[in-house]
């Protein structure tokens, strides 16, 4: 009778442990990403730098401020009586410097390209923060699943401990085996405490990315294995060239240095200072006026303008080489992440379709055998432990897959769903 009660208790414990479900409010990743875009300080700071650079565009195309001067000529010696000068000797001068044709236009183009670089930096920061939010979300998901499986195992072992004590009373197992089970219970309790502390740290990390109170409560993250990844490598590379902010910044650097080279060549040409002088400004009628034109001559071009051009040419070459190097690194990273994502996807399929069902069937068979008095007690426990470990590996593969997709989206500069396969 006692043995039958022990068997029924063990079977009930196993079924209960496998059926634990924790209900809590789910945490939406999409809503977190939207909140980060709106509130993350790093994104907002990058946006303000972009806006500041856009404001510099009209400034770069503007003429220098003109100058206005007053001149009194032929003042009597030994006096400061300005009214003793002749009317035509009292003059108002207006002067304006005019750079050589095309210089202001090129400066404006350089400012526009620099503003585009800041726009790309803003996009890069946004993608980087989104990637950090996703990784923090996946870390929190993994922590939740580790807790769930640990609680499942703890519930099982606490029940098994009661069964073991009953079996020990019957004399069917040794006291050493009972001690081992209690040690395992203690280990799992300690692991759960550590996971609780880690959860607090991971929640703080996510809250700070959202610019929330670090101690704000969060729901339970959900992760679907339905995330698709079908794009071919060539399509991913094309998307990287078109959309990756870092590559765009290097591309804009090439364009900026081309304009800088053209501007340096124009430094060989003179600028014009135009002055208009109006005489008789204090008399009843205005007197004659004068026009004065002066030119800035690049007389020392062999030590100045010549090297401005050489510098611009070198900067252009450096920008082109840096772009090629960056592109090669990006292509290699895209390939690596795509392969890792496919490997993780294969692991998910292996665990879900093969290993987990096989272990569940094994536990069902072991439970039935033990209930009939033919099974081995420790073998049943080992099967349950293997199932928990396999589920853990499944969740790790799921997180790894989604993290690889997140890193891949960071590399290509946008959502993978927007990448079109080459036909």
Roles of regions detected by a PLM:
Residues 2, 125-241, 337-340, 344:
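Periplasmic alpha-helical coiled-coil/stalk elements that build and connect Gram-negative outer-membrane
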Residues 8-17:
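Bacterial N-terminal signal peptides
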Residues 45-60, 125, 129-150, 159, ...:
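Amphipathic alpha-helical coiled-coil segments
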Residues 36, 46, 94, 140, ...:
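Hydrophobic/aromatic residues within transmembrane alpha-helices of membrane transport systems
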Residues 22, 30, 393-423:
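Acidic, low-complexity, intrinsically disordered peripheral segments
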